[in-house]
């Protein structure tokens, strides 16, 4: 996924879930935060943040804010790492990834935002086989929380996430092949563990889903200021 135009600034504060104040080229700007999660470990006053710039872009003249905050530089013991925190990115990069499978592995049909039962699942896929059509369901979660080189999910309680795991587990029993895909929006992180301290119910539901046959995918990303791709 590519961002058309980016600009960097210095994070000041976050009055609510939706906006932040950022200093850009000496001016204090109100920007839209593309992640309604807490992100307290990332958005620290004084840190460098990356925004997509919509100024003078055709079709976006009526926007209330001219910038989307999409990424942040997090200081570590050795250096800084760039973490993409755009909550809309995971599904977009997964769709790009699915559509680029080699022919021998490609799905014959991919449907984003698929209605399954009383819920929406991120992706429904099909493959034609010698014995019929194989059906797949995939739920996608973005990981932006890192501690000591390990990713954790969620960064805040997610009853919706627990519900999704129960639905995938039930779908496995009906013959679907089901995946939970963690899109790791942090360079160098290869695994994601359940954040038991923040939401023990999610950790329990994850174990139950795995026992039911849900396959867990850890999708590492190449993270740049203006682009993120699954590697």
What is the role of each PLM region?
Residues 59-80:
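OB-fold/S1-family single-stranded nucleic acid-binding modules
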Residues 9, 121-154, 168:
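Conserved catalytic cores of phosphodiester-cleaving nucleases, focusing on short active-site segments
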Residues 27-42:
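Beta-strand/loop nucleic-acid-binding surfaces
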Residues 40, 79-112:
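Acidic-basic catalytic patches of nuclease active cores, encompassing PD-(D/E)XK
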Residues 45-60, 220-221:
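Flexible glycine-rich surface loops and low-complexity tracts that mediate binding to linear polymers
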Residues 185-231:
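Domain-level recognition of nuclease-like catalytic cores that cleave nucleotide substrates
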Residues 16-21:
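Short aromatic-glycine-enriched beta-strand elements
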Residues 149-162, 166-198, 220:
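Nucleic-acid nuclease catalytic cores
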């Amino acid at each position: 996924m590519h961002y058309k135009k980016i600009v960097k600034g210095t994070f000041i504060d976050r009055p609510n879930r939706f906006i932040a104040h950022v200093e850009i080229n000496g001016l204090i700007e109100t920007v839209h935060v593309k992640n309604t999660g807490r992100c307290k470990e990332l958005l620290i006053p004084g840190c460098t943040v990356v925004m997509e710039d919509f100024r003078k872009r055709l079709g976006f003249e009526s926007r209330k804010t001219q910038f989307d905050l999409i990424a942040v530089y997090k200081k570590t013991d050795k250096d800084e790492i760039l973490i993409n925190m755009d909550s809309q990115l995971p599904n977009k990069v997964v769709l790009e990834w699915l559509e680029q499978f080699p022919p021998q592995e490609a799905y014959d049909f991919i449907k984003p935002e698929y209605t399954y039962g009383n819920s929406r699942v991120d992706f429904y896929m099909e493959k034609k086989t010698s014995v019929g059509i194989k059906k797949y369901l995939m739920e996608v979660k973005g990981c932006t929380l890192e501690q000591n080189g390990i990713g954790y999910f969620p960064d805040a309680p997610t009853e919706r996430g627990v519900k999704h795991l129960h639905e995938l587990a039930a779908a496995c029993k009906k013959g679907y092949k089901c995946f939970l895909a963690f899109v790791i929006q942090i360079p160098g992180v290869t695994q994601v563990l359940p954040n038991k301290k923040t939401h023990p119910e999610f950790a329990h539901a994850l174990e139950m889903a795995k026992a039911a046959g849900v396959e867990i995918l850890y999708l590492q990303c190449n993270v740049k200021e203006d682009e993120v791709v699954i590697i």
